[in-house]
Amino acid sequence: MEEGDFSGSSVRSEVTDGRNTTTTTETRTTSELQPKPLVLRLLEVQNGDEAEAVGEEGQEEDYEGSKTHKSHEVSASFRSHNSSDPPQSRKASDSLRSRKGIEPLEPRKTSDSFRSLMGSDPLQSSERQEDGKDDLFPNAVIMTSPSLIARYLPRLQLASLRAHPVTRDLVKKCFYSRKRVQDLSKPKKQWGTPDRRLFWGNQDPIRPVSEAALKAKLSKRIEDLAQPRLVSRHYVPNRIQYYYSCGRESVIWEISPPALVTRPSKRIQKLAKPNKFKAQSLIKRETVPGTTRYSDPSPRILRLSIAKGTNPSYLPPKTLETKISFSTLSAVATPRIVDLAHPRIKIEGLCYERERSELPIRPVAPAALLANPSKRTIFLAKSKRVHEDYLPIRDARWPVSYAATHSQVSERVQELANPHTRGPANLVYYDPNVFKVKPSALKAHCSDRVKELAEPIVR
């Protein structure tokens, strides 16, 4: 912005005359500290273009007359500039630097005004070089640096880009929603799945829609174009389709409709059948190098390859189904077999009748009731004695003692009850006393036997 505001004429005025630099910069800064409104600046640009176009004709004639004295005047001005006091040049450079920091922003001129300024540039330079005419020789040569004459190209403002190319009228600015653009610039979390979440603030479009567009009525042509296009049966998709998305081997081949309707000819059916090799062609066929050729089978191998016949006395395995003879099916059971076939009938779940509740289940014979047992039977009938240290089975529920209910836990028991604490796995702990040597070991002296054992074995 600041570099484009410096014109070539202002730079040349500093080179030709060091005394006038400070005055020109000061007057220019004071005039530019208060910028004019945009409409007045545009009118001044248009009026200046017309005035420069009229003044070009008069300046061309003066330029031809002053061209002969150009070399003499420039060399004189160059000498006068070298002979001038150096503090003045420093002041000019300081004023130029202050001008760069203080100079307000000016609107960029249009391309037409820039071309007109480029056309009138040499005329202005010739006029400013007429100040010194005394010190130049007739054969002097002009040497000027390109950095002093080069004009900085003005940067076009956004307002000039939005202007109409013919009328130069500014178009109304369109404001963008910065938040909406940032949301759209972010990549999607998952490819192919749109983000359907809606919350307050992301429903606004990128550009604000005007009221006229919202109230506009659609024409028949736009309604016809808004309808989706009908897909034809001859439509062929652009990308390759697959049966399964996991692999790339199962491609869906495109078969034309006439190929599905047509019938193959007899010639095609004959060619579609596999070839039948003849024995002569197999014998005459050349062997491929690298393959093994087997010899013809011997008569013994051919005889052994024939399957054996079954023996006429061979009986096949018996089937699972058992066949019952006709005599067994037609036999008649006797009454005794029928009685034995019935299950035993139990009375009240017992095999015998119970006379009284005191008597045993099974009846005892009278001889057994009158018999006298021997001493051996009486000894065996007695139960064994229980051991002195025997304790009976404890009940599932027993009372807890008073001492157990009113006991207090000691510090040692609490310490043992706590689980063993371990440090985190990401931290490595080391014991500084691992490589510590005892004082007695430092003062110890090795015996002759230990020294002998410490020496390596000589082989």
UniProtKB/Swiss-Prot annotation:
Organism superkingdom: Eukaryota
InterPro entries for the chain: SPMAP2-like, THEG
Composition bias, Basic and acidic residues: 64-73, 91-112, 127-136
Matching Pfam families: THEG
Compositional bias annotation for Acidic residues: 47-63
Compositional bias per record (Low complexity), positions renumbered to this chain: 21-30
The protein's name: Sperm microtubule associated protein 2-like
Null mutant phenotype: Deficient mice are viable and have normal fertility.
Keyword Aminoacyl-tRNA synthetase annotated: no
Keyword list, A-Z: Repeat
Polar residues bias locations: 77-87
UniProt keyword annotation of Cytoplasm present: no
THEG repeat segments: 172-190, 212-231, 258-277, 291-310, 327-346, 367-386, 403-422, 440-459
Region Disordered: start-end pairs: 1-138
